[in-house]
Amino acid sequence: MLAKQTERLSFSSVKNKPAYPDFLDLQIKSFQDFFQLETKSEERGNEGLYNTFLENFPITDTRNQFVLEFLDYFVDPPRYSIQECIERGLTYSVPLKARLKLYCTDPEHEDFETIVQDVYLGTIPYMTPSGTFCINGAERVVVSQLHRSPGVFFGQSFHANGTKLYSARVIPFKGSWIEFATDINSVMYAYIDRKKKLPVTTLFRAIGFERDKDILEIFDLAEEVKVSKTGLKKYLGRKLAARVLNTWYEDFVDEDTGEVVSIERNEIVLDRDTELEKDHIEEILETGSKTILLHKEDNQTGDYAIIHNTLQKDPTNSEKEAVEHIYRQLRNAEPPDEETARGIIDKLFFSDQRYSLGEVGRYRMNKKLGLDVEMDKQVLTKLDIITIVKYLIELINSKAEIDDIDHLSNRRVRTVGEQLSQQFGVGLARMARTIRERMNVRDNEVFTPIDLINAKTLSSVINSFFGTNQLSQFMDQTNPLAEITHKRRLSALGPGGLSRERAGFEVRDVHYTHYGRLCPIETPEGPNIGLISSLSVYAKVNGMGFIETPYRSVTDGKINTSEEPIYLSAEEEEGKKIAQANIPLKDDGTIDTDRVIARMEGDFPVVDPKEIHYTDVAPNQISSISASLIPFLEHDDANRALMGSNMMRQAVPLLRTDSPIVGTGLERQVATDSRVLINAEGEGEVEYVDANKIVIKYDRTEEERMVSFDDDSKSYNLIKFRKTNQGSCINLKPIISVGDRVTKGQVLCQGYATEAGELALGRNMKVAFMPWKGYNFEDAIVISEKVVRDDIFTSIHIDEYSLEVRDTKLGNEELTNDIPNVSEEATKDLDEHGMIRVGAEVKPGDILIGKITPKGESDPTPEEKLLRAIFGDKAGDVKDASLKASPSLSGVVINKKLFARAIKDKRKRAQDKEDVAALEKKYDAKFANLKADLVEKLFTIIGGKTAQGVQNDLGEEVMPKGKKYTLKMLNAVDDYTHLTTGTWTTDDHLNELVADLLHNYKIKENDLQGNLRREKFTVSVGDELPSGILKLAKVYIAKKRKLKVGDKMAGRHGNKGIVARIVRQEDMPFLEDGTPVDIVLNPLGVPSRMNIGQIYETVLGWAGQKNGKKYATPIFDGATIEEINDLTDKAGIPRYGHTYLYDGGTGMRFDQRATVGVIYMLKLGHMIDDKMHARSIGPYSLITQQPLGGKAQFGGQRFGEMEVWALEAYGASATLREILTVKSDDVIGRAKTYEAIVKGEPMPEPGLPESFNVLMHELKGLGLDIKLEE
């Protein structure tokens, strides 16, 4: 028998929808590309961690004598499993090692041998299979960042007087920014790093266009004329384009060195734009100039007036002057010599050490400027600078367009891998610095790579990134949808991004390039709106970091359905006409209408089908996962849909899950891709099932058995009552029985907001839209008592309480149930370690973990010490430091854990040695058996065949070519993990089998090594705990929360409300057949909010309940009103759900029909139990002595200024005085009042409020002496 799966009837009309990409690809693929562990080192691309190493190595010392070269890196298996890390508060990480080679290039040190070593570089947090990182026991997600792409951007702004100013900004991947901008006088300046400005022509001179002539030639602006008396006469009246200079050299003696130095001097004879007159000819001849430059006579030069204006402002005349001018601008000092001055520009923009556009920047630059510079040339070139200035001039003359900064071709995604690369870059650069220093210090001593490297450098950078970076976030784990959405989130905030305060409306707005890439609906409400968005369902991030979305290509009005969809980035999509996914088609895929509404950039032209380039692949391609889960989204207002998508992420997993009757067809994919459930790995039969584990016997061929080291049966452990980050509960239960046949990918369990392999965030409820005695006024909700009684909205929440035992200066703390001055009743549930027993019911104030800590007191006298020793009075020197239940905590203890560090004494050390030896012996036997197994299997496959020369990693031949394989020969090989899998025999099929066998052997051997390492560590070190902590005790308390008045509920359409009344079932309105409704919603919540989708859902849900069917109505492609009417008619229920209801109290029929049906409701994480709070006495603020505020601080209710006015208005002076003094900050008064209440005496007079004293001290701080007089 096959296990059950929910079948959904789909209303979709669009055929050929492609499969969704894996929803976690954004995280997992990015991380895999970063580490490239599956790839052999010689095949690794120049990306990720490998590239970061190559950028920082080789490292040489200052004299270039020693070189440290990087060869390869690898990681060892993690020490703990993910679950162990979560329980012990550890980081799930892998040890990173690099193979480094140290050699000497100096012939004097010929005795120095080349050393190759594997060096430990620290432990690096490793991604779990579900795309998260476990850091210090908490699951975290690194959110991808959406930032400005490197490249060149052209923009415009307006001066106060209305003049348009244009600018071009070059944003590099690393290095200084350079900006070219115009000012109101039509002069073009270059700004370096946004602060220092210089005329563009100065920059031109500095990069090699030394003379005016060279600069004017770039733009073809001048005519060169030979100087001769007669020749110049015909040019009289024309204007000079460049200065006429008189140049000479002066010699002077440098006083410091005594050298003779010659200096070039320039004198301006005629300035630019001087009209050539007769008198000038003589002056020009005297200078000895061979040629002069004149303005061209054609009218084309008007466009380039800005260059002439800039030359006028340019104070320099030669390359030397230009570089010195730039040096002075940037350094605010005179250049020491010409070379230093020249070096500054080279270093800033032309050195690949300091400056890089990155691959993306070069690509964008070439695209924008129409250049063809090689992709690996990642510094600025002269051509880049010239082309940018030319483009800017075109912009000024309205011959080019400015860039749209919010266009997705100008924004790119920095995924986890890239962010980690950057952090590794920082860490390795620091490490390189220390290595260089150590190399320089160790001159002639013999040293090895290990001596040079400090492993802490790298891991401290990486750990601070995961711990404190704004983009490394505590995972939202309320339900599977919240997890998956958090991993697919894109944030414009964070280092190198925007800040909330500075972001304007344009950045936050929906842009036409978001179509199919970023969801226009799902974004937070509040200050982050539009800055944090979600990736659309089909979107992918390409190698450059740009978001792509799939389309089907169209040729001559016919869609190519047979081909795979084509992924296009925003830039590639420009200028293309794209049709909707649901256009009518003929059977052969030809568009079946005369005119088509298409999308082209931000426009919607109506065009001929032959003009269409592409069509969308699916109607829901525009939205993210959350929005695609809202049925009938097309009938909802976008603002409400936004609330709906956000609230689905806050839905608490319920005790009894139930998938929606009206879904959208995406529910299964979300549940699968969230990696919460267990799926069958192939065809097979269920052998054993209980609440904790499932065992499946898989069908395998003889060959599969041959290359595997595992049994046919595989057992899966189910997660039971695991606490999530948000305190909700993951508890999986099997949905298959012994003897069932399972297929590959089939879901074996349910729970944690899933049912039968589908996402199930809430429950289907019988609903009536009608007012009920005013109790559902303003979005309040009326609920039937049956909902509470049947545990329909009951959820389990787990709290973790922990207590650390530290060693203090006065002695060690201790866990115990023997606590001073505490009754036996209070400690009855504690074990000998002071931990509460599993199953105990906890009430506020109960002791959860008993702990005593030494009390700091004056040293006892010798007599006291003696008496204490005799009578054992220990209570005097310890105080109670137990963990007690907080005021709102009640529940049942479901688990407890105690972790302890191993205590080392001589006997224990000896015992440890024995235990480790026994362990090693046990594992040696396991390794031997595994190898014997391998040899036997290998012999079965290739025994008697001729060897083709098998080599190991180092290229040494292990099995000689031409010999036949024998058992002896196979047994003689020491290490099978380092053999090349390749040509063992001449038969390719056998070679593949051997490769698979060796691969599986490596995995198995690795697992055993990991287990051995872990067990050894546990024996010798005990539990790994942070320093200074001897023991860590944890208690888990579960609370079963039923639905209560004050809990927040919501539908999927942004229809949220608070439970206002729980009504007896017999008092609820009922249908004609006597069925009472479960929930009554206010009809006034629908029309003004314009989320009519909930009404469609209600009606279709009722039809589904009656017909016993579940439906999928994909967004923008869902059920029409006609289809719903057909189903309601078939089910025998009234159209539109319009039904007469009867009053539960009187049995009378209500006058008007109401809409009745089945709606899917969620219980949200905002529960009254977490919010309700009361205080009589509690903690006070240190300075003002007023009560603290908030539930977390066990605070009081603030009685503010306006409340004081209210009491003043009533003339309630005594109440007011009491509130402002003894109930607040009159310290002496409140103590006396408490005493008076206890003793039953009359209330004393209030004293002076502490806040008055604070004011007095403030005034004294200002130097005013204030005396109080009676």
UniProtKB/Swiss-Prot annotation:
Entry keyword annotation includes Hydrolase: no
PROSITE patterns: RNA_POL_BETA
Catalytic activity entry: RNA(n) + a ribonucleoside 5'-triphosphate = RNA(n+1) + diphosphate
Source organism superkingdom: Bacteria
Enzyme's top EC category: transferase
UniProt cross-references to InterPro entries, sorted A to Z: DNA-dir_RNA_pol_bsu_ext_1_sf, DNA-dir_RNA_pol_bsu_external_1, DNA-dir_RNA_pol_su2, DNA-dir_RNAP_su2_dom, DNA-dir_RNAP_su2_hyb_sf, RNA_pol_bsu_bac, RNA_pol_bsu_CS, RNA_pol_bsu_protrusion
Keywords: DNA-directed RNA polymerase, Nucleotidyltransferase, Transcription, Transferase
Database matches in SUPFAM superfamilies: beta and beta-prime subunits of DNA dependent RNA-polymerase
A GO CC term assigned to this protein in UniProt: DNA-directed RNA polymerase complex
One Gene Ontology MF term: DNA-directed RNA polymerase activity
Quaternary context: The RNAP catalytic core consists of 2 alpha, 1 beta, 1 beta' and 1 omega subunit. When a sigma factor is associated with the core the holoenzyme is formed, which can initiate transcription.
UniProt similarity note: Belongs to the RNA polymerase beta chain family.
Protein name in the entry: DNA-directed RNA polymerase subunit beta
